[in-house]
């Protein structure tokens, strides 16, 4: 079994769940924040929608430069979903095409010339999935605070039973 074959089932499950969360994001709450120091809901949703693209970058490139990363805007939910679907398809394709040796290649997160960290691609892919799941969890709290039903994720929520049960 290849590394990609071990990653893809988890990736598929997490992306399916993430899409269900993004579907619930109300477009009219883009500027809403639970606290002045928090991201706005629109910023957080756009971050979550874009993060699968970071996996594509990690598998196909050797660095990501945050200084070149576009800023955040407030997108309609439909646009976020289109972006998310495009990023998921690209990441899945990159993962499926990868060789085990690709995961040992060093990858760096940079801001201009400053290197924030460098790690093997395999660690970066896993950390990116974990990072996305973390922000997805934040987004579910935002949804709850604006009275939007929270979908089932790893089990039932107060709003939705677990699918298939």
Task: Show the residue positions of the predicted features.
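Short coil/turn linker and secondary-structure boundary residues
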Residues: 2, 39, 72-75, 98, ...
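Acidic catalytic patch
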Residues: 97-112
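Helix-adjacent hinge/juxtasegments
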Residues: 57-100
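Active-site rim elements
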Residues: 3-8, 76-81, 125, 129
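Short, contiguous pre-domain boundary segments
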Residues: 1-3, 67-68
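Short, contiguous alpha-helical
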Residues: 8-23, 27-70, 110-165
